[in-house]
Amino acid sequence: MISTGIGWFGGGGYSHIDVFTPAGMLRGARSDVHKIDGVTYPAGYIDRPENYDDANIVRYTIFSLEISPAQEAMYWEFSDAQLGKPYDPRGIAGFAFGQRDWRDPKAWYCSEEFQANCEYATIFRKLPPELWRVDPGDNAFELVQCGASWLTTEFLT
């Protein structure tokens, strides 16, 4: 239900963003705990196995964007420094209640952490401070504007 609302209010159907790490894991901020093969993956900004949420995925899109080696190094430098930080429920509340500083690094909402990584690595231009939230649909727009290609896969529900 929450995922549907995020996609709806985000204007594109996207409700979450993860990034493939060089080790083949998916990295992102989640509010829920996952148990896979006896391993517990807590809520927060962490790496999870590629199949961690297969039972709940209705559709996914893989974006591919060419960046420089320096940008890639900066992306992972910032991302690695955020590992283990808690999930930020204010990201969802921002859809309804408005202004907040989404760049506050104490906790992360998935799309806002991704945006911060990309801004730090100069992949995306820095957004104006007047914008008080970034949702997964915003990330899709930014990626396409930067020249990303994409492949969308649909699943039967």
Please give the residue ranges for each predicted region.
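A structural signal for the main folded, soluble domain(s) of proteins
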Residues: 16-23, 84-90, 129-130, 142
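Hydrophobic/aromatic-lined pockets within catalytic cores
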Residues: 22, 83-84, 118-123
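Activation targets extended, charge/polar-rich intrinsically disordered C-terminal tails
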Residues: 92-157
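Glycine-rich catalytic cores of cysteine/serine-nucleophile enzymes that process amide/ester linkages
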Residues: 1-66, 93-102
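Active-site-adjacent helix/loop patches that line small-molecule binding or acyl-intermediate pockets
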Residues: 54-97, 108-111, 115-116
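Small-side-chain structural scaffolding
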Residues: 18, 28-31, 75, 79, ...
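General structural signal for secondary-structure boundaries
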Residues: 35-52, 68-71, 88, 127-128, ...
